[in-house]
UniProtKB/Swiss-Prot annotation:
It is found in: Secreted. Keywords: Disulfide bond, Ion channel impairing toxin, Knottin, Secreted, Toxin. Ion channel inhibitor. This is U3-theraphotoxin-Hhn1r.
Length: 32
């Protein structure tokens, strides 16, 4: 199971293509 866009990544890893925001602790698109 993985965390999708804008989902919390405190306990789960983000789904493929997303990164965990260190500030907000949710999954976002990687910065260009």
């Amino acid at each position: 199971d993985c965390a999708g866009y804008m989902r919390e990544c405190k306990e789960k890893l983000c789904c493929s293509g997303y990164v965990c925001s260190s500030r907000w602790k949710w999954c976002v698109l990687p910065a260009p």
